[in-house]
Regions:
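Boundary/junction segments of secreted and surface-exposed precursor proteins
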Residues: 1-13
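Residue-level detector of intrinsically disordered, flexible termini
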Residues: 5, 34, 91, 179-182
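Edge strands and adjacent loops of beta-rich recognition modules
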Residues: 178-192
Length: 192
């Protein structure tokens, strides 16, 4: 699994209810043979590549015994990727956005939280790796790291056992992110 070489990333000062969107723009300079995305998080996620949803899994990565394991999904994203054109000097641009909402792990009053404040959640964290194999046999891995951007989404509260709140007037989207910043690499060891 290539995800083992990626870093957990999060929004700086992220103890809040706002749902973050992690974003990575990258190019492909030649035709792509296959591409896969390995991803998991400490909440629930939805991945979108070039404006199209990745996979059909709702509430991914699903529930698990968090003190022992996290589930990792692997998606074939070849058809969603903008491949390079060998007759054109420009790289094909791709944008991957992963929204991480609160799930079973990131919920209020969970035994592993350090607060009883219902407005505070553990920071949303993400780990992922894109694996691209080009037609010439060369490979590229794009892991989660400090090159990713993170912004607040228009979702101000989400949860499995609570309602969701949206603030559409914030007008945040991939073209106009709210408080975009570089993702912070989480340095502490995660026990899986």
């Amino acid at each position: 699994m290539l995800i083992q070489n990626a870093s957990w990333i999060r929004m700086k000062d992220a103890v809040s209810t706002v749902v973050p969107v992690f974003k990575r723009t990258f190019g492909t300079s030649q035709p792509v043979k296959t591409a896969t995305l390995e991803v998991t998080c400490d909440g629930v996620y939805e991945a979108v590549l070039n404006g199209k949803r990745v996979g059909e899994f709702i509430l991914a990565p699903g529930w698990t015994e968090y003190s022992k394991r996290l589930q990792v999904q692997c998606y074939d994203i070849t058809a969603l990727l903008a491949g390079g054109d060998t007759h054109n000097e420009k790289k094909a641009k791709n944008t991957l956005e992963i929204t991480v909402g609160n799930g079973w792990f990131r919920r209020t009053n969970a035994p592993w939280t350090k607060t009883n404040n219902p407005d505070e959640f553990l920071p949303a964290m993400l780990i992922a790796a894109l694996h691209i194999i080009y037609e010439d046999g060369s490979e590229e891995v794009i892991p989660t790291d400090a090159r990713w951007q993170v912004a607040e989404s228009t979702i101000t509260l989400s949860g499995i056992f609570i309602t969701s709140r949206f603030c559409p007037w914030q007008n945040c989207d991939s073209e106009h992110p709210c408080s975009a910043a570089t993702a912070e690499v989480f340095k502490e060891k995660i026990r899986c």
